[in-house]
Amino acid sequence: MNSKVLNTLEYQQVKQQLAPYLVSATGQQALNELHPMTSVADIQRALDETNDGAEVYRLKGGIPVARLADIKPHMKRLAIGATLNGSELGQVGRVLRTTRAITRFFAELLEDAPENDIRHLFDEVAELVTLPDVTKRLATAIEGDGHITDEASPELSRIRSNIRRTETEIRNQMGHYTRGHDAKYLSDPIITIRNDRYVIPVKAENRSRFGGIVHDQSASGQTLFIEPQAVMAMNDRLRQNQVAEKQEEQRILEELSNLIAPYQDEIINNAAILGHFDFINAKARYAHDMKATEPAVSPQNEVYLRQARHPLIDPRKVVANDISLGTDYQAMVITGPNTGGKTITLKTLGLLQLMAQSGLFIPVEAGSRVGVYNEIFADIGDEQSIEQNLSTFSSHMENIESFLAQIDAHSLVLVDELGAGTDPQEGAALAIAILDAIGAKGTQVVATTHYPELKAYGFNRPDTINASMEFDEETLKPTYRLLVGIPGRSNALDIAQRLGIPQAIVDQARSLTDTDSQDLNAMIADLVTKRKQVEDEQLHLKTQVADSEKLHRQLKSEFNAYQQRKDQLIEDAKVQANTIVEQSKTKADAIISDLRKKQLASGTATVKENELIDAKGALNALEQQPKLKKNRVLRRAKAQHDFHEGDDVLVKSYGQRGVLMRQMGKHEWEVQLGILKMKISDGDLERVKPEEPKRARATVQSAHASHVSPNLDLRGVRYEDAMTQVDRYIDAALLAGYPSVTIVHGKGTGALREGITNYLKSNRQVKSFHFAAPNHGGNGATEVQFK
């Protein structure tokens, strides 16, 4: 990608926004190397990595990468046999400890959420080498700031213990001078150090009162820093221990340097992976804070940005716009007055395309697509060079001339105020010729202009569409909303009239304007008004649909709760009834037992044994069975709704027979209807007797193939009715055995087309779908292939 367009579209400013999210030197290096890519595979991989990072951020708040310095220079020194200092070893140790922490983090993540697909990150984690023994040794010996710990070696611990003990002895001894009767002979009652030896500040005139050695004096000569005779031996011992400490520390540094030397490549690779994780972290957090989403990548350069926002404009002020290119048209001409937002729209398209090709999420709504351009060329009005002594027109022409020789079918051209800076008539003619030249090479182009002549261009040229920026006639201010399909209209006379210019002057100006221009402006104004009405109606319908769906969910939830409560009450009543029956049985058993005893005692048998058994059986029959298996009153009705896998059933709402595959909920079953599997409520099912196979096949063939058409025409049908028809039609077509069908929805506002597209995406029986060929309806019809 040429560097000029990166500057023009402010790509570097996006990188500057991303920089504060990084914590490692290697991550910063990855940001410095960030650039737009032109390979679909490379772009998709980078986007997948960002998506993985976003998923980890959602689950765990991000990958725990610590602040890491650049250790490559240390490894280069190590490679030539140098000994690393404490600070360098501390930084290497931090890399190894972070490596261990990251490995554990992903192991726990895999255990906690094995269903999450973040394979790109797991692949990189698998390349990390933890080196547990080396990590432990460095952690024990070196602190993060490079300080060598007492635990680095037993000898160092012993030496430092001697140093601390000797320092205590010296301070205790010298405390006699600073706190005793000799304190009055000192300049200050303190203990200090000169030439690595403990001394006291003595007034010069009292020199003779203290033995020892003078190590220094003050600038005025009034104070002498004397090492008293009493501590000289202790200072000597302290100094010897300090020398031994330095020698032991140097030995430890050499030992640790030799310890990590064989693992230079592994440590460098670990640092690179950690830096990459840091960069992925930064991309994910940046996307989260910017409310950005992952776009789909279109190798055919079919761009569709839903509610695109410029990332460098204050989120509280930025206006979102839908921008599309490459599907229904290859060129867009945005007309209208200045300061309406045309330039920002150009920059938004270009910058978001650069960001996506760099693997960054972009500030758009879900469902957006970006292209893959080998080059993007931009001629934006505010980047003209005055210091080169070029006029606006000349600068424009130089820019355009430079990219006309380079563009092809894989390029995107963005031109601001095409043909500006010269005679309007000639400028408009030149602009049309330039657009034709760009279109002849198959290059996609978005151009802005205020020339009215180019309004007709969008109507007359194939694969070209007009657009404009909306203007609020009430406030006399631009709204910065892009209106695709509507050319810009001149508002100068209306604005002048509203701002108080005398009516006579405005009327005279209108009379001087040719009739065609007035008619065109009136037509555009009418289009804008009707578009606004349609958008308002759409918004109203969406609100109604959302409210209806919410109400439906509430009613369904309440109905399910009612069903559960009803079932529970029935079960409770059965339990209570069974308790009563059980109590009665107990009493009856006692009575029968008593009767038997009396019969045996009297030797008579007035009540036969089989009669006793029958009476007891009748009592048992009173017990309420929870499953109703023995309740003769409800058994027949229950049998039709007692479902099991493999049962033949009738789906009442479709009038079709099917087979139960599996239970999916308390009141829902998966039913096989021909080649179609559907989730059906048990209230819509009735168990039936199996039919003969031949008879069943004949029923399917005759019931559907005879009256289901391979085409569904929805033109003129309201949105809600159309979506209902589509749902039923797809089911019927599948049952009829059609491999594919065509849905004719017309072009219109695109709302029905979008609704059908979303439905087909969510239908598991749909293999693929696409717009029909131009001679079969184009984007006014959708062809659907089934699995």
Swiss-Prot record:
Keywords: ATP-binding, DNA-binding, Endonuclease, Hydrolase, Nuclease, Nucleotide-binding, RNA-binding, rRNA-binding. One of its GO terms (molecular function) is rRNA binding. Its EC number is 3.1.-.-, 3.6.4.-. The keyword Nuclease applies. InterPro entries: DNA_mismatch_repair_MutS_C, DNA_mismatch_repair_MutS_core, DNA_mismatch_repair_MutS_sf, MSSS, MutS, MutS2, P-loop_NTPase, Smr_dom. PROSITE patterns: DNA_MISMATCH_REPAIR_2, SMR. GO terms for biological process: mismatch repair; negative regulation of DNA recombination; rescue of stalled ribosome. It holds the Pfam family MSSS. The keyword Hydrolase applies. ATP binds at residues 336-343. Residues 712-787 form the Smr domain. It is an enzyme of class 3 (hydrolase). It comes from the Bacteria. PANTHER family: OS10G0509000 PROTEIN, OS10G0509000 PROTEIN-RELATED. Homodimer. Binds to stalled ribosomes, contacting rRNA. Belongs to the DNA mismatch repair MutS family. MutS2 subfamily. Endonuclease that is involved in the suppression of homologous recombination and thus may have a key role in the control of bacterial genetic diversity. Acts as a ribosome collision sensor, splitting the ribosome into its 2 subunits. Detects stalled/collided 70S ribosomes which it binds and splits by an ATP-hydrolysis driven conformational change. Acts upstream of the ribosome quality control system (RQC), a ribosome-associated complex that mediates the extraction of incompletely synthesized nascent chains from stalled ribosomes and their subsequent degradation. Probably generates substrates for RQC. This is Endonuclease MutS2. It comes from Lactiplantibacillus plantarum (strain ATCC BAA-793 / NCIMB 8826 / WCFS1) (Lactobacillus plantarum). The lineage of its organism: Bacteria, Bacillati, Bacillota, Bacilli, Lactobacillales. The gene is mutS2.
